[in-house]
Amino acid sequence: MSSFRLQSDHMQSDASLMTSVRKATSIDETAPKRKHVRSCIIFTWDHHTARPFWTAIKVQPLLANEVQTFKALITIHRVLQEGHKSALVDSQSEKGWLKTCERQYDGESSPKGYSDLIRDYVDYLLDKLSFHAQHPEFNGTFEYKEYISLRQVDDPNEGYETVYDMMNLQDHIDEFQKQLFSNFKRSNKNECRIAALVPLVQESYGIYRFLTSMLRALYSTVDAPETLEPLKHRYKSQHHRLRQFYADCSNLRYLTSLISVPRLPHDPPDLEGDDNIPDLPKRPASIAPQPTGASTIAPQPTGTSPSPPVEMNFPDTSDITPAYSEPEPIQDFWSDPTLDQQLAAQQAAQQAAQQQAELAAQQAAAQQAQLAAQQAAEMERQRMAAQQHQQALEAIQMAQAEQQRIAQEQLAQQQFQMQTQGQLAELEQQLLATRGQLEQSNVLLNQYDARVRTLENELSQAGVNLQEQIHQNDDLIESLKNQILTWKNKYEALAKLYTQLRQEHLDLLSKYKQIQLKASSAQEAIDKKEKMEREMKNKNLELADMILERDRARHELETMHRSQRDKQESTERELRLLQEKAASLERNKSSEVSNLLSRYNTEVAHLEDALHSKDRELANLGVELKSTENRYRQLLQEKEEELEIQKAAVDESLLQLSKLQLDRNDIDQAMDTQIDELLKSQLEKLDDIVDSVLATGIQRLDTSLYELDSPMHAGNQYATPEFILSTIENASNNATDFSTAFNNYFADGPNADHSEVINGVNLFSTAIYEVANNAKGLSRTTGDDQGSDRFVGLSRDLVNMAKRFLSSLFSVNTRKMDVNVKTDLVIGENIELQRYLQQLTQYSEKFLNKESENTVGLLNAPGENIEELVDNQLAETAQAIQQAILRLQNIAAKPKDDSLSPSELQVHDSLLSASIAITEAIARLIKAATASQAEIVAQGRGSSSRGAFYKKHNRWTEGLISAAKAVARATTTLIETADGVVNGTSSFEHLIVACNGVSAATAQLVAASRVKANFASKVQDHLEDAAKAVTEACKALVRQVESVALKAKEVQHEDFSSLGVHEYRRKEIEQQVQILKLENDLVAARRRLFDMRKTSYHVAEE
């Protein structure tokens, strides 16, 4: 249970880290929030690693946006500076990713001006990592624990090299801060750029303090100070530049609200005149670590669970020398009062002996000076006294050794007693643990019983669902057979009709030849021949129509056969898979349940037998005890023997109990092994399901490729550049969510949620399909063949990249990979896919008109209220619709023109009523679209504001605004055209074109809402119904206009039966010439229309 709890906590912390990284690297051009960066730093201190942080960084779509990339570099810099020391070690292997960020913006000028800053920032971070790799004794803020007390220098060459490397890094900081100041914008906020100055100020000041202390130590140690003159000159230059840098930073109010900017004196500190110069300690590998003073920039953590610093308070300029604390004396752990007294007595005896020796020596010297003659005797006496003194000292030392030995024996005895008590306590803890494990095993057994019952219920439910699906498939197969039979009958009837018409055609040809031979000079024969020719032409036309109808029916029949055959095969395949899965599941579950029940029954039987035997033994013991009590005084010896027998029986029963406990442990181990195998088989089945879902996504992408290359599929003809950009943004978000879901699936292992992966595959493949379909539709309206081929080629490359992405995630390819390798694979493929999407986005932006570019500028402007912009646009559209309705009503209320006939007045009234119906349907459509976008924003914004949601999904907002404007313009054009038709200034063809424009604008608005609509949304269904109503009203108006035009043509129909052969031939040639001219005019008009549409993408609409 503890391992599951730890795994759950680890998953929660990873999810919290992912959220903090995503919020710290948001798309907004603001500084990363302190609490999000602090969460990342605390994570490295809590887990002593930075690998999850780098994984979270690489999962985000940073390379698609320059602001996100720059904010990510700031976050990485803060983690390297204030995070755990393992962050510097783990980041050494991530230099390749940093170089990828640099290459992404190499040689390009970005719209917001971050490309140069990103390249310089990456260069500095790589330089910093190289420095820490060469000098691992430094932390992120350059506070070396062993360099605090600088008194003596062991190796001046090493100190010189360290100072030289740190000065190079200080120069790099100075170059980068100058680049930052030169890129400040006057019109926009510079919070994001100022945030990069915070770690630079902290690191530069830490390096400055260290250089000051190190140079003072070198000057106090080196014999030739002139060798340090280059370093001194460079130090002074850096001092003045650093002072200017801090002065510039003090003028930034936002920066001073975050940190305290240091203040340096005008003149650099004196490096040679300080008497209290600290010494330079030895290397960390050769001395034991000493306690260090507190750092003023980034306090070092203490204890086992350190916490990183939050506020960075810089000291004054006078506090250059770091604090120093002397090492504390080591206390004797085995100190004892009796031993202290003994040692004091020994020291007193030694001092007395020394005093006696000194006194004897003084007396000997005086006697030697006075009595030179007795020198030999005195020397002998002194030798004897020294020998006696030596013997006394040896006796004292022996007594002290004996006392020390006795004290050590007592201490060893005490340690043995304490060890024995510890072993007893440990045995008691093991006994309690064994009891707890027994209770836990009973609870686990109950859980297994409940799980078996749950699996039985699931098995029965799966069987019921399988039977229902089988019945549904049978009904579907039966309906398909009926449809096939119906189409077959239609085909046979058409074949018979075609045979009959062909026979009639042959008969007419034979009659025509006979009449042509007989009627060479008679006018009557000529008339009959012409009549026969006309009849033959009509028959030929009917025959051609029937042939076309036959070919169309044959094609539809083949298509229906093919689709029904594919559906039947897929249904049969799914049915077989379901049957096999159900059978295998039933076999596995039944065998597992039977095995578990048999084991449980056997174990219960063994335990019951043991319990009964123990009860019988206790009953026998009770009887024997009663009998022995009655015969106690008479049979004392027999009682003792019986007690011995009873003791042996109890020992045997205890042995049996221990054996039963061992057997139970073996059973539990076997059950755990079987459960692990069952889980492994279930995981393999789930992997197969994920592979099948990936295969379905690839099949959908293949369909998209076929439709993209097929001339029979025109794509979405109503697609606009704004809508294309919104679908690309949706595809980018779905790709990121899909990558995140798969990384979680790889990282969680058996505890992974497969539903997120399956949902992510479906959403990802659908989004790519929509991008390709809309891209093809937009490419057909550009009028530029080369540009159209380029656009379709980019879409084809995107679909192929998505197929490669899905193909690389099959279990066959990833089964033998490590989790980190799998995660890197998903991240790399996602980055490559985002690059393709970025290319398609850049090419699509070429088709935006000036109005759309102005909309984009308003969306990206920091001071604009996006909520009011969107609401005002929808309100203006609704107001335009209401004005159109009022205008139509005013036109209808005008007095009728007396010069028009009643039929013409009736036609005008019907056209006005149909136009009013269209505008009313459009008004309902606008209301439904307003409700739909309100629902989308309410469910998608979460805790953020509406304006933040619109800015985050700016492409979708552009498409929505553009679609609303298109509806308003199309409605206005329809009203003006209807007024022109009534007044006689416009033709019926103008009205048909206006209706088609309304239908296209309606489809664009519905598609813009459908991109972000929720699944099974009632509001979206209402919007779809309103769009259908508008389309039906437009079709009704078009049919009405066409019927009026057809009646006019019938009135103007000429009679050609009275014309002669020559006149008829001349009329026919003139008509063909007119048709050819009209066709040429039609081609030219279409070319002009293509040019106008192409130009409309670059010129503002009036």
Curated annotation (Swiss-Prot):
Gene3D superfamilies: 1.25.40.90, I/LWEQ domain (1.20.1410.10). GO terms for molecular function: actin filament binding; clathrin adaptor activity; clathrin light chain binding; cytoskeletal protein-membrane anchor activity; phosphatidylinositol-3,4-bisphosphate binding; phosphatidylinositol-3,5-bisphosphate binding. It comes from the Eukaryota. The keyword Ubl conjugation does not apply. One of its GO terms (cellular component) is cell division site. GO terms for biological process: actin cytoskeleton organization; actin filament organization; clathrin coat assembly; endocytosis; establishment or maintenance of actin cytoskeleton polarity. InterPro entries: ANTH_dom, ENTH, ENTH_VHS, I/LWEQ_dom_sf, ILWEQ_dom, Sla2_fam. Residues 292-305 have a biased composition (Polar residues). It is found in: Cytoplasm, Cytoskeleton. Residues 338-661 form a coiled coil. Belongs to the SLA2 family. Required for cellular morphogenesis and polarization of the cortical cytoskeleton. Required for establishment of new polarized growth zones where it acts in actin organization. Involved plasma membrane internalization and is essential for fluid-phase endocytosis. This is Endocytosis protein end4.
